[in-house]
A protein has these predicted regions:
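Cysteine-centered nucleophilic/redox motifs
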Residues: 156, 160, 165-179
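Sec-dependent signal peptide recognition
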Residues: 1-2
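A contiguous, well-ordered beta/alpha segment that forms the leading edge of an enzyme domain
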Residues: 5-164
Length: 179
C-alpha cells in the first residue's frame, strides 16, 4: 500500500508521440516541467517529427532523393552540385569517419545493400563471396569525396552514400535543439 501511495505521488506520465521514421518506430517523450503545457509539448513534438520526415525523405539511400541523385552521379564519374545542407552533412560525416579511422563510414552503401539492409523489406542475407570481394577491393569511403563549394566529385566510383546511422544522430541533435 505504501508503494502505491508513493507511486501516485511521482511524476506525471510524459507526453508522447510516435512514428515510423528512418526504418523503426521512434517515440518522443516530453517530461512535464515548469512553463511547458501539453499544447506546447505537442507542437514541439510535431516539429521534431516533421524534421525527421524531411531528413528521411531528402537523404533516403534507395528511394529517389537528393542523396540518390548524388550517388548516381558518383557512379557515372560526374561531379554533382548539392544543397548547402548536404554539403555540410558530407563534411561533418567525413570528419566523424576520419576520427574513427573510417570504422563508421557512410560511403559503404553498396556493401550495406549487398548484405540486404537497403530496402523497404529488410532481408538480411549472406552475400555472394565473389561480389563481396569485388566491393571490398573498391575500398569505398566517404573520404574519397571532394567538395568544391557545393560541387562533389569522387575519386572512387564505388562510393555509395548511405546516411542511415549518421542521419539518426543528426536527427537527434536537431530534436534536442527543437525541444
Amino acid at each position: 500500500l505504501v508503494i502505491l501511495i508513493l507511486a501516485a505521488c511521482g511524476r506525471p506520465e510524459p507526453w508522447r508521440r510516435d512514428a515510423y521514421v528512418f526504418g523503426p518506430r521512434i517515440e518522443i517523450l516530453v517530461q512535464h516541467s515548469a512553463g511547458v503545457d501539453e499544447n506546447s509539448a505537442g507542437l514541439a513534438m510535431g516539429e521534431v517529427l516533421r524534421e525527421f520526415e524531411r531528413l528521411h525523405h531528402t537523404y533516403h539511400a534507395w528511394q529517389p532523393s537528393e542523396l540518390t541523385a548524388l550517388n548516381t552521379a558518383i557512379a557515372a564519374g560526374r561531379s554533382h552540385e548539392v544543397s548547402a545542407e548536404l554539403a555540410t552533412l558530407i563534411v561533418d560525416a567525413q570528419k566523424i569517419a576520419a576520427a574513427g579511422d573510417y570504422l563508421f563510414d557512410p560511403g559503404i552503401g553498396k556493401l550495406i545493400a549487398l548484405w540486404g539492409f537497403q530496402g523497404d523489406e529488410i532481408v538480411a542475407r549472406r552475400p555472394d563471396p565473389t561480389q563481396l570481394n569485388v566491393l571490398l577491393a573498391e575500398h569505398p569511403s566517404i573520404g574519397d569525396l571532394r567538395l568544391n563549394n557545393q560541387t562533389i566529385t569522387s575519386k572512387n566510383r564505388g562510393v555509395v552514400l548511405d546516411f542511415g546511422g549518421y542521419l539518426k544522430g543528426v536527427a537527434l541533435d536537431r530534436a534536442a535543439v527543437i525541444l
